[in-house]
Amino acid sequence: MPVAGTVDSLSLMGTKGNIPGVTTAISPKRVAPSPPVTIPWARRDTVALAIVAGLALLTRLIGLTQPTAGGTPIFDEKHYVPQAWDMVRSFSNPVLGGIESNPAYGLVVHPPLGKQLLAIGEFLFGYTPLGWRIMPALFGVGTVVFTLLLCRRLTQSTALGFVAGLIAVFDGVLLVTAKFGMLDVFQVFFIVAAAWTLAGDMREAHARMHHAHITGNFGPRLGFRWWRFATGVLLGLALSVKWSGLYYIAFFGLLSAFWDLWLRRRYGVAKPVVGTLLRDVPAALASLVLVPALLYIFSWRAWFASETSVYRHAAVDGTISGSDWPWLGALPDAVASWLYYHLSVADFHASLTSSSGHSHPWDSKPWAWLVGARPILYYSATDIDCGFTTCREMIFLFGTPAIWWLTVPVLLWSAWVWLTRRDVRVIVPLIAFAAGFVPWLAAFDRQMYFFYAAALAPFICVLLAIAVGYVARLGTTVPLKWVRKLAGYPVTTGQLAVIVYLALVVGMFIYFAPILYGIRIPDFYYALIMWLPSWR
């Protein structure tokens, strides 16, 4: 019996054209992927950016030169500020800069860039609190600005970008990180800026793929990707501040490759995996691995140029031959000495474990970071006579609870909307958060502190802003006339909830301001604001 619906069966039946009442079955057409939506930058974006930047600058400059330890640095400033001053004093030319020669605190265990940036402020304003804190404050403002820009790019929403920036302004971790002459603020800035450029590359790759002709088995070549190159530059700068920048190179590199694979698969490339490996991965390796590596080496230029930098001639002075790595002696002196320095630093970091007897009263493990359970004390002055009672001045690296206590819920929610609603806006902040959190779980025996979590803060702010966008669309119109009159338009219960939340963030920031700025307070007020035993 002939098979109905085929050309052969129709010809055997002597039928021309369509059979009355019968429709030829066809496969459903695949819906063409849509291009990324881009809303042009407008005047309202500039206004939002100016407001957030102004608030960030104000909050970070207030009390910037206080406190000190009798005019000298406090906390870990004692390491980095003298090292930066060494660079100023040994300055030879603007290309090379100076070197760290201060041996008072042992081996210099972080790359030079953070100290080089501190040295700019000290060069301009001298060895003063303003000199060693002005650059962190400015980079702290930049971190808030890029948090806004990242959210604006991901959501294409002025309002949500403004919300992310506003939350970042009033986060205690980002505030305190920006008020002291330490390194973390520089790395946080470069990381959040790298996330912004990576988001730009992902959008650009999507647009190029959408407009390309899909031919061959491997799909189109997408050309040189300047946003990805910029990401590599910023990741190289992050690595040149602290080695933990390596985690972001790995996570951002994998995200870039898998995004390209998803695009090729989404646009119907016959062999998307091979196409990604051949046409995307080599260029990604050049931009996201080679470029950061070259920039990292360049950050050591003053060390290579100097004759007196630490371990500069470890190969020829016998240091290497008596070490655990004598094989380095086969390499050229500069290379061998530089690698010996790095292996010595790696050995130092590996030795800072609880099991080997190292301990610190403010040690904090990664799971505690998720709720800001263990802040870290930066400054303390107690038993101050203030009339009818005693007072104190305290500064903690302390996360605003209205932000940090929502970290776990917003992470779970973001993963859910990614997996169930395919909301790709959360991908970059989620992966960036993972890069700053997951690797530390593998090293849980190591001494760790809450300032390691500083790079998590901008991405928490962005995810909270995206969640706020969902909440704002919920609910019904608030039936109160005064609310509508005050707003000038009908306000939904979801929008009202967002307003209440933002007010809570600002209110908590003000409530905890004494332990963020070192404001003198009575002991009884200190007891009131230290809610948890682990905060003390």
Predicted regions: what they are:
Residues 56-59, 164-169, 176, 235, ...:
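Short helix- or helix-capping micro-motifs
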Residues 48-53, 147-170, 207-222, 427:
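Transmembrane-helix signature of polytopic, membrane-embedded enzymes
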Residues 134-155, 193, 410:
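Transmembrane-helix motifs of polytopic, lipid-linked glycan transferases
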Residues 136, 173-186, 241-244:
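Short acidic/glycine- and proline-prone juxtamembrane loop motifs at membrane-interface regions
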Residues 61-67, 77-116, 120:
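Extracytosolic helix-loop segments that constitute the early lumenal/periplasmic catalytic or substrate-binding loops
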Residues 3-6, 14-19, 23-26, 219-227, ...:
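Transmembrane helical bundles and short interhelical boundary loops of multi-pass, membrane-embedded
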Residues 13-16, 34, 154-155, 194-227, ...:
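Membrane-interface transmembrane helices that cradle and orient dolichyl/undecaprenyl
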Residues 41-77, 289-307, 504-512:
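Transmembrane signal-anchor helices characteristic of membrane glycosylation enzymes that use polyprenol
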